[in-house]
Amino acid sequence: MTSERYNARDAEPRWQAEWDRQAIFATKNDDPREKYYVLEMFPYPSGRIHIGHVRNYTLGDVIARYMRARGYNVLHPMGWDAFGLPAENAAIERKIAPKAWTYDNIKAMKKQLRSIGLSLDWSREIATCDPAYYKHQQKMFLDFLRAGLAEREKRKINWDPVDMTVLANEQVIDGRGWRSGAVVEQREMNQWVFKITKFSQELLDALGTLDRWPDKVRLMQRNWIGRSEGLLIRFALDATTTPNNESELKIFTTRPDTLFGARFMAIAPDHPLAQAAAKDNPALAGFIAECKQRGTAQAEIDTAEKMGFDTGIRAIHPFDAAWALPVYVANFILMEYGTGAIFGCPAHDQRDLDFVNKYGLGNTPVVCPEGQDPASFVITDTAYDGDGRMINSRFLDGMSADAAKEEVAKRLEGETRGNEPVAERKVNFRLRDWGISRQRYWGCPIPVIHCPNCDVVPVPEKDLPVTLPEDVTFDRPGNALDHHPTWKHVDCPKCGGKATRETDTMDTFVDSSWYFARFTDPWNDSAPTTREVADRMLPVDQYIGGVEHAILHLLYSRFFTRAMKATGHLGMDEPFKGMFTQGMVVHETYRKPDGGWASPEEVRIEVDGNNRRATLITTGEPVEIGAVEKMSKSKRNTVDPDDIIGSYGADTARWFMLSDSPPDRDVIWSEEGVQGAARFMQRLWRLVNEAADAGKAAPQDRPATFGSDALTLRKAAHGALDRVSTGIERLHFNVCLANIREFANELADALARSRSNKSAPARDLAPDLSWSLREAAIILVQIFSPMMPHLAEECWQRALGQTGLVSQARWPQIEPDLLIEDSITLPVQVNGKKRGEVTVASDAGNPEIEAAVLALDAVKQALGGKQARKIIIVPRRIVSVVG
């Protein structure tokens, strides 16, 4: 047995260099074996990896190493999501060019990622800011343009007059730009959009085929697409109250059954009817201007106070010409949804109820819960949105809500106004086309030219890529491409006249919406994909990333795959067969006496029984241990991966990341847990060496028979192999590690039993036991190799004397006969309460099990001398006795 400690600092870089020297993780596209594509969401090159990256990439690496050992042709690439605003901010703040800042960061982060020991094919490395990548993105933009999947349209946008850029709704906070603090203006601008709505129904339907995606992710996408069936109703307007002879107001509703509960109409501030009414109404114009300064994120609108302005316009109820409904401009109605107008039924919609309570419009309940007396059913502060029977609804009274919807639809479809039906059935989607225009320098240029004679002219493909100029300055707000003295000035490729380039660049979500396809053949200079290779390697078998990307990134990637199929670049619809969203790495917080935050490195933790006490290392002052939260620089509860790897080694960090929690849940970082992982690594090293020593005298050939001790050990080894294999395939990594720990204990026990005399030489062991100990050590090394690959390589060659690399070894074959249990232990309940356990032969029949159960003293005592009335046996699960 070796007394030498395992030295991770020496071993890890040595094995990483050997993997690189032999290029063992490089994937060949012409490999005839079945492929397996595992991919983690590629990182933004911010300059440093964080501990969350270590977890994310370790999860994928375990899968990649396991599937490679199972004989698959594994594709496990890495690249950089390299365009984006932080590079421009760095240019402004640090006076460094975005390109230089980005590539410096890539160099630093690549070194860090290599130190984790990831089995990546670095030969396929891509950076989205590389013209060799984005020239193909520009080509696909032109393909989409020809196919009607990209177009230019006027859109209402949020304009930051200080930063001089368009802001997403989520970037407007209390009516101000999130970065500049300037009051945001609502403008109409020409924007490039991708027509994702052409695939609305298809994107929705296909969610049902993604059975290896988390249910919560599919639900989030389903809600974002937002399919709803309803009626488009044309409300007539009272001509005496409307401006410019406006005659009707169209609304889309999913609840036509509640029409008799209507108390008001509401339109968006930028609805054409609102704009027309405001021309001669300064107060209304002021209210609309105020609405335009509020936040436009849906979450902010939902929580803001509901405000409205009565336009004086009156809409006529479609079932009662004498029933006039006031038309309000309301701050909670968005022009982008439906028709930008609603009818308000306050009794059955909380938002509408809050509104009418504010303005004293009252409410009329029209759906009464089953069993409730309609005469006593009233609504005050809480709307009722459940099922029931119709009341206060004339010809609908007594119907179910569904029957009432159908009746309203039939009646209004049958009525006409101006040769058009008053209502028609419609399917509406919440999903809107994807606006990709960004007024930023550091992004993929949009390959079009604006000519005063020819309008919009695509850049000829022979002139791609349209590259970014490097001699730009950031000394004034706005897009540096607009300010460049020469870059945007070109000749029109169609007429030869003077023209200008498009200075908007693409949303960075475009860059990450197809990178997975480029990885299949990043060397193809003439096309975005090599179709035959892409169709063979895609879809990605296992995609891994944070749930924060559950909607936009995944939805845009699903659209892009379909658009690439429509333009001949791919042959499939879905990009990711399996999707896994890992939890975050969190850490407790520490607050100093002065109210500031202390980092974990500044704090000493002392444990006294169940109590933990924290003090500052430098002063000894007490520190308040706060809540466990997401790691953030502001609260200084971050952990530097370099420090952990430098102190303990990458394998320790990898093991800890996998062992503490199920991978879809948050893992709480603790120094004690990391130290425990480091101790276990040393234990494995000692255990493998001891087992290897004990197995040195083992015969080359498998013994014909095995004694009891050898057979027990072999069953433990193959049972662990089976459970770890299943655990990795099910992504139950923490369970795998628990099984490895359990098997390590069983191997240690077997070694202890084999030493009847501690000084006895290994050659004195029985051949079957010696062979079984060596087999067990080999299996142990192989099942922990996906998690601790460096330690596994060291054990494989130095301790076990194996040739080659464990990273290239085939996964051990499970012997099914060794998985058959000789006996099973079943819990025993009497009258629903557990009273004990019974161990019986695994092939025991019900009579034998019943006899063994009734012989238990605990069962006899629970029955109190009475006969059991019934014994229920759930095979291999539980025995229930009814007394």
Swiss-Prot record:
Subcellular location: Cytoplasm
This protein's record includes keyword Secreted: no
Catalytic reaction annotation: tRNA(Leu) + L-leucine + ATP = L-leucyl-tRNA(Leu) + AMP + diphosphate
GO function terms (MF aspect): aminoacyl-tRNA deacylase activity; ATP binding; leucine-tRNA ligase activity
Motif ('HIGH' region): 43-53
Coiled-coil spans in chain: none
Motif ('KMSKS' region): 630-634
GO biological process, one term: leucyl-tRNA aminoacylation
Pfam families: Anticodon_1, tRNA-synt_1, tRNA-synt_1_2, tRNA-synt_1g
Gene3D superfamilies: 2.20.28.290, 3.10.20.590, HUPs, Isoleucyl-tRNA Synthetase, Domain 1
Location, primary (coarse class): cytoplasm
SUPFAM superfamilies in alphabetical order: Anticodon-binding domain of a subclass of class I aminoacyl-tRNA synthetases, Nucleotidylyl transferase, ValRS/IleRS/LeuRS editing domain
Keyword Cell inner membrane: no
Residues annotated to bind ATP: 633
UniProt entry keywords in alphabetical sequence: Aminoacyl-tRNA synthetase, ATP-binding, Cytoplasm, Ligase, Nucleotide-binding, Protein biosynthesis
EC number from the UniProt entry: 6.1.1.4
CC per GO annotation: cytosol
UniProt record similarity statement: Belongs to the class-I aminoacyl-tRNA synthetase family.
Protein name from the UniProt record: Leucine--tRNA ligase
This protein's encoding gene: leuS
